[in-house]
Each structure stands twice: as structure tokens, then as C-alpha cells.
Amino acid sequence: MLSNVLNPSNVAPARNRRSRRRRRASLLSKYTRQTLAGLLAFFVAAFLLGQLIPSPTIPSNIVFISPKYEHYQAHKDDYDTLFFGSSRVYSQIIPAVFDEAASEEGLSLNSYNFGIPAMRAIDSTVLLEEVLANPPKNLKWVFFESILDKGYEPIPNARTNRSIYWHNWKNTQFAAQYILNSDESLPNKAVLLSSHLLPFLYHQLNVGRLFSQLLPSTFTVEEQTVAAEFTATEGFYALSDETTPERQYFLNAQQAYLDSVAVLGGRTADEPWVETVSDEAYLSANKVVLLNRVSETVRAAGAEPIFIDPPSLHLENDFQAAEQLGTIDRLLSYRDPNQFPQLYVPENRYDVDHLNRAGSEEFTRLIAKDFSQMAPSKAAQAKLP
């Protein structure tokens, strides 16, 4: 203080520094308020957009899903049988072959393949619910296939229209419940839950929706070609590209594939096949809820559910356990390389996970034959005159 009295020139710089600090604090506070106000205005505008321009159940810009949904909406009353699932339905069940084989068994059916590549448990169920919200008037049977995974939404998918469109409040809550009711650890549940956060936020903020609804949707030439092919074959798309990495790996690793088939069968060359489903079947609570939800959705549409376990090398036995526990009533399972060797021989496979066209025809005929034998009560309604 004495130095300031003796040296008054020191006071002014100190006051200037304090004044500058106050101005900076004031500006920071002002910018913070403006930023918060801007964010609030953005969220309100996004919400109002959602109210003024309601989002369609399935937008027109979703690869694979939109073309199938549009065809279905235009022709749904022509069908009495629908197939839902992943690529193991999309590229392995041929409606024309199924209908023909069913006719040979005395049944008159008209089916459509609603399989979509890379579908998993949650989004498969969501799609089923969306499609059957307005079911065909003559719907009798719905076949459902899915791997009951952990519920993870891959990060690369988070910003895609295919993931964003279904992450509304209702469906995201369903995904959260599926994860929370699983047997995963708390840290794993946190990771799984977080994977749905970004597509949920994008959906709520209507990212890209204004343009997708006001402007015509466009697909790549390849996507349009594929859509034209599966539209012409009632939703089925044959895997035939010999240049894909999956195909090349399969061709170059035949022995590894055959070894995996042996493991699936529970045997080696000198050991008999051993049933892989244990006597004490178990299914986690979240999977029970999901399968019940699928069955309830199908029955609410006036049809009966049939679950399919395709010929794959996955060792999970969720559908078999569900059947043992009474969670599902009807299951067609083909994960037995001894009972169905024709579905596992390399000449009928496209890659490790999928059948080729010849294998798909064989698989489809088996489904039609087994279906005709397992559901006589409902099938009687569809008998040929």
C-alpha cells in the first residue's frame, strides 16, 4: 500500500488487469448464455420439426428395407406367409420354391421373404412389429429367424439411416430393457447401452430427415440393381459373386470349414454325434421377453409364429432352449450336420455362413416339407381344394 502511495503509477496497471478479467468473465458468461440459448432453440426446432413433419414408419431411404416395405405395402394382401430374419433368410429361402414344395404337400401358400442382411435380435423384432402393424388380410404364418445377440449397435451403423430410423423413444427403450435384463456384467451393459445413444440422439434431432422427406431418395446403382433382383423374386437374393472376400476365404479354407462342421456336430471322424442342447435348458430373461414379444406380435396379426434355426456354424442353442422351456411352440432347426448333411457339404455353400443357390433350394424344400408335417391344424385351412 505504501508503495502505491509513494508510486501511484503502479495502481493503474493493477486496476486495468482487474478490469480486463471482469470483462473476460462477462464475455464468457454472455457467450455461454448465448450458446445455451442456441442449443435450446435447436432442440425445440428439431422437436417441432418432428411434430410438423411426422416421420414415416419406415422411410424411403433405407437400403434393403425400404424397397421391400414399399413392395409389401403395394402387394401385402397377396401373401399369407411371411419370412423374417437376417441374410440367412434373405439369401437362403426362395418363396417360389417354398410355395411349389408346399403345393406338393397339399398346401396352397403364397409367401414373401422379408429377410434383411445383418439383422439382429432387436432390429428384427422392431421390423416385424412395424410390418405387422398393418398385416395382410389373409396372413396365416410368420417364420422368424435371428441370432439372439447381446444387443450391441455397431458404431459404424450409428450414423446410418438404417440405424437412426428405428431409434425412437419406444424402440430405444425396448433395446435398453433387452440389455438391462441380460446376463451381461454392469460394465458390459454400460457399453451396450451407450452404443444406442448416438442413433437415438440423431433420431430425436431429425438428422437428415427433412431432406430425405422433401427430396427424392436415391440409392447407388448397385443398390438399385440388387433391389430390382430381390423384388422380382419375392424378396429372395441369391449369393453368387465369386469375388467377395467371404467367398474367397471359403474357397481357400475348405478344411477349416469342415473342421467347424465336425465341431458343430459334436464329433470327430471317429466319434458319434452328441446332442449339443443340455438337459437343463437355459435362456436369459431378456431373450425370453423378446421371443414372447415376437410371438405376441404375430398372433395379434392373426397368424401363427414358426421359428427357424438355419444351417449355420454358430454354437448358440437359444432357439432349442426356448423350445425346451416352452417359450416357443414351433421350431424348425437345421443345425445338425448329420441329419442334414446336404446343407453342410461345400458344394452347397456360398461361404462359411451361407448357402449358395443350390443349397438354398434344398433348404427351402426341407422347410416346406417339415412345415407341412408340424402344423396340420393350421395347414388344414390352406389345403388345396
Segments the model singles out, each with a brief description of its role:
Residues 160-289, 293, 297, 384:
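Secreted/periplasmic serine-hydrolase-like ester/acetyl group-modifying domain
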Residues 317-385:
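C-terminal regions of proteins
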Residues 93, 97, 123-126, 174, ...:
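Extracytoplasmic/secreted proteins, especially bacterial periplasmic and envelope-associated proteins
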Residues 84, 88-180:
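Membrane-embedded segments
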Residues 113-115, 309, 335:
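Residue-level recognition of beta-strand->loop/alpha-helix junctions
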Residues 42-109, 126-127:
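Membrane/wall-proximal cationic-aromatic binding patches
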Residues 91, 117-123, 282-285, 311-318:
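Acidic-and-aromatic substrate-binding clefts and catalytic sites of carbohydrate-active enzymes
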Residues 1-31:
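N-terminal Lys/Arg-rich, disordered targeting/topogenic segments
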